[in-house]
Regions:
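N-terminal membrane-sensor/transducer module of prokaryotic signaling receptors
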Residues: 2-153
């Protein structure tokens, strides 16, 4: 009887933790999503990849609060998993709440080391608050960068 009570308690005490963490993506999942986009880009080319990324039904590039975006190194959005209305817009001068140039920072990572993390503040659609976010960025081909952001928990 004690064993059953212990197992029930252990199961119930872990469930809320799992539910709380499963609603947000992780850094490892963000990196994996960028790698999937890179693989598709190399295999299928830019047009097919950008179309797949911008399709909200495509679960390879959309998972909970994670989504892929791709910009040219000049700052023009060419694919966006959360806001397709941004496609075609030059956002090189967009700033976060603290006045940091968001897309410029992504471009610097892509042109410099070729991959890395960019930190900024951004609206979280799940909480409707401005929150700390970090995005994993990689240069994609010669002309683009690809990224996926994670809200810091």
């Amino acid at each position: 009887m004690r064993l059953i009570a212990f197992l029930v308690f252990a199961t119930l005490s872990v469930m809320p933790l799992h539910a709380a963490t499963s609603e947000f993506g992780t850094k490892d999942e963000a990196v994996a999503m960028v790698k999937r986009a890179q693989e598709m880009f190399k295999k299928d080319g830019a047009d097919a990849t950008f179309k797949a990324i911008s399709d909200p039904a495509n679960k390879d590039f959309h998972d909970r609060d994670l989504y892929v975006y791709v910009y040219t190194l000049a700052g023009v959005c060419v694919a966006h998993g959360a806001r397709p209305a941004l496609i075609g817009k030059n956002l090189i001068d967009i700033k976060d709440q603290d006045g940091n140039y968001l897309i410029r920072a992504h471009v610097e990572v892509a042109k410099g080391p070729g991959s890395g993390w960019v930190n900024y503040k951004w609206p979280n659609p799940l909480t409707n608050k401005i929150e700390d976010k970090t995005s994993y960025v990689e240069k994609m081909g010669d002309d683009y960068f690809v990224g996926v952001g994670v809200y810091k928990q």
